[in-house]
Amino acid sequence: MDAKINEQVKNKKQDNLITAEIRYKMTAKGMMITEYYGADSCVVLPDEIEGETVTALDAYAFARNLEVEEIWLPEALKEVGRYAFYRCRNLKKLILGNQLLDMGGGALTGCRLEEVEIYFREGKKSCLKSIVEEMRYQIRVSLYGYSWR
C-alpha cells in the first residue's frame, strides 16, 4: 500500500466537499445517482447517500454539462449508464475504483477525456478496456494498485 498516494486521495476528497447538486434514487442494486446539475469544475461523488452505498450512475447523469472538468466516481460504483457523460466537452479527467466493470455504451461520447486514474486492488478486473474502446484519441491512464482509502 502506498501511504503517500492514499493520503493524496483522502485529501482530495476532503478538499472537494461533496455537493448537494445531485439527484438520486434507491434501486434493488443500491443507490443510483440519476443527475448532476451543478456547475463545479471538480466533482467528487459521494460513496454513500443516506447510509446506502452508491453503486450506479444513471444514463445521461452528467449529459451536456459544460462546467465539469474532473469527476471522482464513488469507490463502490459498479455501473455507469449509457451516455452518462454525453457531450461533457470539458471533461478532462475521470477517477474511479476497481468495482466499476460496466461502462454503458456511448458513456464518453462527445468528451475530450485526457486522463483516467484507476485505483484497484490486486487481482481485480477494471473497466479500462471499455473506456479505451470509446476513445478516438490519445489518453493518459494511471493505474494504482492498492487500497482506495
Regions found by a protein language model. Give the residues of each.
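A subset of signal/propeptide-processing and intrinsically disordered low-complexity segments
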Residues: M1, K10-N11, N16, F85, ...
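The feature captures the LRR N-terminal capping module
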Residues: D2-M32
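Structural signature of tandem-repeat unit edges
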Residues: T19-G30, Y37-T55, L66-E79, R89-D102, ...
